[in-house]
Amino acid sequence: RNPFARLVSTYKFLVPRLPPPNGGGSKVHLNPSKYRWHPGFNNTVSFEQFIHIACTDKQYFRDQHIHRQVDLLHIPAISYEFIGKIENLTHDLSFVLRKLNAPSWVVERAAIVDNKTRADDRLSDWFTTELAEKVRIHYAEDFRTFDYPYSLPD
């Protein structure tokens, strides 16, 4: 998944009912049942602090949603024949199902999208120039390996 969209999605998952910060953003309370947070923040974290921790603080950041995807997939230690993308889920899943000779009704059912994420909606509202650059640097291998553009999606 595109690192920008992935980080926004994770932040929204960890912080219920969160609107975009629109440049400044207020601090919000993380749901402690979902996350063991950095002790210095008393469970109150702005999106800017969240990105800073995601991109720099390895000691406290243990959530797999934030790890680089190349590390989670153990690339290049494991050589994958095919890696699908969430952005192309319907197409990629159909490809895999056809390769597995799945029945046509399974392929047709898999093509029905009923849980589209909104994490890509206006990512520019979430990222300042500085935050976007931190993400580009920290997740550079993800951008390269999975051929994601370094620019924020529109």
Protein language model annotation of sequence segments:
Residues 105-153:
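PAPS-dependent sulfotransferase catalytic core
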